[in-house]
C-alpha cells in the first residue's frame, strides 16, 4: 500500500505466526517497523525463528491469548526489552462452533469468548501503559462483519465480534486524551483454511453440500467474492500510518459490502 512510511515503530501483533497475522507482520516489516509477535502454534513459531530478522526486527514468543497469566508473562518479557510501543493489533480469533444454540457445549461458548474477546482485553490492558509511555499510538481490533449482523448457527462467534466493536468504541473515548487511537477492522469472508472449515461445518449442520454453502457465503456480499488476507493487511497498514492520525473509534469493513449473514 502506498502510504507514507514511518520507520522504526514497535508494533505488537497477536496470533501472528501464520495467516492474517503473519501477513500483517510482513507488510509492516516492509514498512521498516519492528514487530513483536505471539502465537499458540509452536511449530509455526519455530519456523519464524529461522527468519533472518529474528531478534533484530522480529521477536516472537508462545502465548495462550485466552489465558491472562500467559499474556501478562509475555508483556513482562516485552517490557524487559523496550519501554514503549507504537501500536497493538489484536488479531486473535477462532471460528467457534456451528449449530443451534441449544446444542452447543458450554465449553465451546467459553472458548470462543475467551479467545475472541477476552484475549483483546488482556492484550490491551497490558499494552496501554506502553502506549502511554509512547505519548500516543494506535490499537486495531480485528472484529468481523459477523459483528454487524445477526448470524444464525454462529451465535458465539457473532456475540464475541459484536463485543469487540463495543470494546473498540469505548476504548476510543477512554484513550483519546492520551492520543491513542482505537479502531476495528471487520473482514468479510476471508479466503483460507478458516472459512473452509466453517463451510464444512455449516454444510454438515444443514445437511447440504459444501459447494452450496460456499456459493451462499459469496452471495452475501455485493461483490460476490471472498476477500484476501492482503486486503485486511492493507487496511491495517493504513490505520497505523500518519494518514490515519485523525481516525479513531471507527469500524472499517473490508468485505465486498456484506448485505446479510445467514
Positions of the model-derived regions?
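Substrate-binding pocket helix/loop in short-chain dehydrogenase/reductase
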Residues: 99-101, 108-113, 217
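Active-site helix of classical SDR
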Residues: 124, 160, 168
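C-terminal helical subdomain
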Residues: 184, 208-243, 247, 254-256
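Short, small/polar-rich loop/turn modules that mediate ligand/substrate recognition or access, typified
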Residues: 176, 181, 247-249
